[in-house]
Regions:
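Iron-sulfur-associated redox domains of electron-transfer enzymes in respiratory
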Residues: 1-206
Length: 206
């Protein structure tokens, strides 16, 4: 979550070194595309405003070239008279854990699943900071050395990315719709899914 990372940088700079070096899914996908097609221009479209600040952060090489909100792409399509119609789509690319990334707790669940699949029987405690207020509280506890959990999953928007400021649906309705789609996901594991990609061609770290 770029909003969470920005919060750390601005208000808790002493915790900068504790932030994961893993880049965001937006950046990871952009790097993967550019590894295959160096001349590609990548555009992220979603409900997140903080992605715009991440795009202009020159320290993140290979990131998306542009970030647009749903409001912006909707306005562009309306101006051009484009009307989207629902289509049947049975194609799936991400694992169910990847599909849950947009929900609060989704990233933490993926980390725990990775440990499980890799045979690392580690009992880790996760602080799922849902929304800016919980993020601030968790970071303050960490700063004081009083955070009881092992790591923080920080989501600046309530409910996770689905609660972003450019979301057109009510948060509960958006989560309900996403949960319905997630139920249709197959049962492939994370590592099995990652085997479909040439991970040696790009880096997932800052």
């Amino acid at each position: 979550c770029p909003g969470f990372v920005n919060m750390v940088r601005k208000h808790y700079p002493e915790l900068n070194d504790a932030v994961s070096t893993t880049v965001s899914p937006m950046c990871g996908v952009s790097r993967m595309i550019k590894a295959k097609d160096p001349g590609a221009v990548t555009v992220f479209i979603g409900p997140c405003l903080a992605k715009k600040s991440e795009v202009v952060d020159q320290k993140i090489e290979g990131n998306a070239d542009y970030a647009m909100t749903y409001s912006e792409i909707r306005a562009m399509m309306r101006a051009k008279g484009v009307a989207l119609e629902p289509v049947e789509n049975t194609y799936q690319e991400a694992s169910v854990f990847g599909k849950r990334f947009g929900n609060s707790g989704g990233v933490a669940a993926a980390v725990q699943e990775c440990l499980k699949e890799s045979g690392n029987d580690i009992d880790i405690k996760v602080c799922k900071a849902n929304g800016a207020a919980e993020c601030k509280k968790a970071l303050l506890l960490m700063k004081l050395g009083k955070l009881p959990e092992d790591f923080i999953e920080g989501m600046a928007c309530d409910g996770g990315c689905v609660g972003g400021p450019s979301s057109f649906k009510d948060q509960k309705l958006a989560k309900k719709s996403r949960d319905a789609l997630i139920k249709e996901a197959d049962d492939r594991g994370i590592y099995k899914n990652l085997s479909n990609y040439d991970e040696d061609s790009f880096s997932m770290h800052r």
